[in-house]
Amino acid sequence: MTTKNKKAVENLEKTLTKSNLVDSAEQLELLVERVKKAQKIYSKFTQEQVDKIFKAAATAADKARIPLARMAIEETGMGVLEDKIIKNHFAAEYIYNKHKNAKTCGIIKENKADGIKIVADPLGVIAGIVPTTNPTSTVIFKSLIALKTRNAII
Protein backbone atom coordinates (compact mmCIF):
# COMPACT_ATOMS: atom_id res chain seq x y z
CA MET A 1 0.00 0.00 0.00
CA THR A 2 1.41 3.40 -0.94
CA THR A 3 1.95 6.07 1.70
CA LYS A 4 -0.79 8.17 0.11
CA ASN A 5 -3.27 5.27 0.23
CA LYS A 6 -2.27 4.43 3.78
CA LYS A 7 -2.93 8.03 4.86
CA ALA A 8 -6.32 7.96 3.12
CA VAL A 9 -7.25 4.75 4.93
CA GLU A 10 -6.12 6.17 8.28
CA ASN A 11 -8.16 9.33 7.72
CA LEU A 12 -11.20 7.27 6.80
CA GLU A 13 -10.80 5.14 9.92
CA LYS A 14 -10.99 8.29 12.04
CA THR A 15 -14.39 9.19 10.58
CA LEU A 16 -15.90 5.77 11.31
CA THR A 17 -17.07 5.91 14.92
CA LYS A 18 -19.46 4.10 17.22
CA SER A 19 -21.39 7.31 17.95
CA ASN A 20 -24.67 5.93 16.62
CA LEU A 21 -25.10 3.27 19.29
CA VAL A 22 -28.60 3.01 20.73
CA ASP A 23 -28.66 2.30 24.44
CA SER A 24 -32.29 2.88 25.42
CA ALA A 25 -35.79 2.11 24.19
CA GLU A 26 -36.47 5.84 23.86
CA GLN A 27 -33.47 6.33 21.60
CA LEU A 28 -34.57 3.37 19.49
CA GLU A 29 -38.10 4.74 19.11
CA LEU A 30 -36.74 8.14 18.06
CA LEU A 31 -34.38 6.51 15.58
CA VAL A 32 -37.16 4.39 14.07
CA GLU A 33 -39.37 7.47 13.64
CA ARG A 34 -36.55 9.34 11.89
CA VAL A 35 -35.87 6.36 9.65
CA LYS A 36 -39.58 6.02 8.77
CA LYS A 37 -39.74 9.68 7.73
CA ALA A 38 -36.58 9.40 5.65
CA GLN A 39 -37.80 6.21 3.97
CA LYS A 40 -41.11 7.82 3.00
CA ILE A 41 -39.17 10.55 1.23
CA TYR A 42 -36.79 8.03 -0.35
CA SER A 43 -39.71 5.89 -1.57
CA LYS A 44 -40.59 8.69 -4.01
CA PHE A 45 -37.16 8.77 -5.64
CA THR A 46 -36.86 7.96 -9.33
CA GLN A 47 -34.89 5.03 -10.73
CA GLU A 48 -32.17 7.46 -11.82
CA GLN A 49 -31.87 8.93 -8.32
CA VAL A 50 -31.84 5.49 -6.69
CA ASP A 51 -29.18 4.23 -9.09
CA LYS A 52 -26.97 7.24 -8.35
CA ILE A 53 -27.25 6.63 -4.59
CA PHE A 54 -26.73 2.88 -5.05
CA LYS A 55 -23.51 3.51 -6.98
CA ALA A 56 -22.24 6.09 -4.48
CA ALA A 57 -22.91 3.75 -1.54
CA ALA A 58 -21.21 0.80 -3.25
CA THR A 59 -18.21 2.97 -4.09
CA ALA A 60 -18.00 4.31 -0.53
CA ALA A 61 -18.27 0.81 0.93
CA ASP A 62 -15.52 -0.43 -1.35
CA LYS A 63 -13.25 2.48 -0.42
CA ALA A 64 -13.86 1.72 3.28
CA ARG A 65 -13.23 -2.02 2.93
CA ILE A 66 -9.88 -1.96 4.76
CA PRO A 67 -10.82 0.12 7.82
CA LEU A 68 -14.13 -1.72 8.07
CA ALA A 69 -12.30 -5.05 8.03
CA ARG A 70 -9.96 -3.85 10.78
CA MET A 71 -12.88 -2.64 12.88
CA ALA A 72 -14.71 -5.96 12.46
CA ILE A 73 -11.71 -7.91 13.72
CA GLU A 74 -11.12 -5.50 16.61
CA GLU A 75 -14.74 -5.67 17.71
CA THR A 76 -15.33 -9.41 17.29
CA GLY A 77 -11.86 -10.81 17.82
CA MET A 78 -12.51 -13.11 14.86
CA GLY A 79 -11.25 -13.42 11.34
CA VAL A 80 -8.28 -12.74 9.11
CA LEU A 81 -7.83 -9.16 7.94
CA GLU A 82 -7.14 -10.05 4.32
CA ASP A 83 -10.21 -12.30 4.17
CA LYS A 84 -12.45 -9.59 5.64
CA ILE A 85 -11.10 -7.08 3.12
CA ILE A 86 -11.88 -9.45 0.24
CA LYS A 87 -15.40 -10.12 1.58
CA ASN A 88 -16.08 -6.40 1.93
CA HIS A 89 -14.82 -5.76 -1.59
CA PHE A 90 -16.91 -8.62 -2.97
CA ALA A 91 -20.04 -7.44 -1.16
CA ALA A 92 -19.68 -3.92 -2.55
CA GLU A 93 -18.51 -4.65 -6.08
CA TYR A 94 -20.44 -7.84 -6.85
CA ILE A 95 -23.78 -6.59 -5.52
CA TYR A 96 -23.38 -3.32 -7.39
CA ASN A 97 -22.47 -5.00 -10.69
CA LYS A 98 -25.19 -7.64 -10.36
CA HIS A 99 -28.01 -5.18 -9.62
CA LYS A 100 -26.93 -1.87 -11.17
CA ASN A 101 -29.25 -2.26 -14.17
CA ALA A 102 -32.18 -3.80 -12.29
CA LYS A 103 -35.41 -1.82 -12.37
CA THR A 104 -36.60 -1.29 -8.81
CA CYS A 105 -38.87 1.75 -9.11
CA GLY A 106 -42.37 1.96 -10.51
CA ILE A 107 -43.48 -0.30 -13.34
CA ILE A 108 -40.78 -2.90 -13.84
CA LYS A 109 -42.66 -5.20 -16.21
CA GLU A 110 -45.76 -4.87 -18.33
CA ASN A 111 -47.85 -7.28 -20.37
CA LYS A 112 -50.01 -5.00 -22.49
CA ALA A 113 -51.89 -7.90 -24.08
CA ASP A 114 -53.19 -9.06 -20.70
CA GLY A 115 -53.20 -5.61 -19.09
CA ILE A 116 -50.87 -6.72 -16.32
CA LYS A 117 -48.28 -4.45 -14.75
CA ILE A 118 -45.72 -5.43 -12.15
CA VAL A 119 -44.90 -2.48 -9.92
CA ALA A 120 -41.91 -2.32 -7.58
CA ASP A 121 -42.76 -0.63 -4.30
CA PRO A 122 -40.58 -0.56 -1.21
CA LEU A 123 -41.66 -2.39 1.94
CA GLY A 124 -40.61 0.44 4.27
CA VAL A 125 -38.35 -0.03 7.26
CA ILE A 126 -36.78 -3.47 7.48
CA ALA A 127 -34.62 -5.09 10.14
CA GLY A 128 -31.19 -6.41 9.29
CA ILE A 129 -29.66 -9.13 11.44
CA VAL A 130 -25.86 -9.08 11.39
CA PRO A 131 -23.72 -12.09 12.37
CA THR A 132 -20.52 -11.58 14.33
CA THR A 133 -18.66 -13.76 11.83
CA ASN A 134 -19.12 -11.37 8.88
CA PRO A 135 -20.43 -8.09 10.27
CA THR A 136 -19.14 -5.61 7.72
CA SER A 137 -19.69 -7.55 4.51
CA THR A 138 -23.21 -8.42 5.67
CA VAL A 139 -24.00 -4.79 6.43
CA ILE A 140 -22.63 -3.72 3.04
CA PHE A 141 -24.75 -6.32 1.24
CA LYS A 142 -27.97 -5.61 3.13
CA SER A 143 -27.55 -1.85 2.96
CA LEU A 144 -26.98 -1.87 -0.78
CA ILE A 145 -30.02 -4.07 -1.39
CA ALA A 146 -32.13 -1.83 0.86
CA LEU A 147 -30.98 1.28 -1.02
CA LYS A 148 -31.60 -0.27 -4.42
CA THR A 149 -35.16 -1.20 -3.41
CA ARG A 150 -35.91 2.13 -1.66
CA ASN A 151 -36.20 0.54 1.76
CA ALA A 152 -34.68 1.70 5.02
CA ILE A 153 -32.77 -0.77 7.16
CA ILE A 154 -32.07 -0.82 10.86
What label would you give each PLM region?
Residues 101-154:
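Conserved small-residue-rich beta-alpha loop and adjacent elements
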Residues 2-116:
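N-terminal Rossmann-like NAD(P)+-binding subdomain of aldehyde/semialdehyde dehydrogenases
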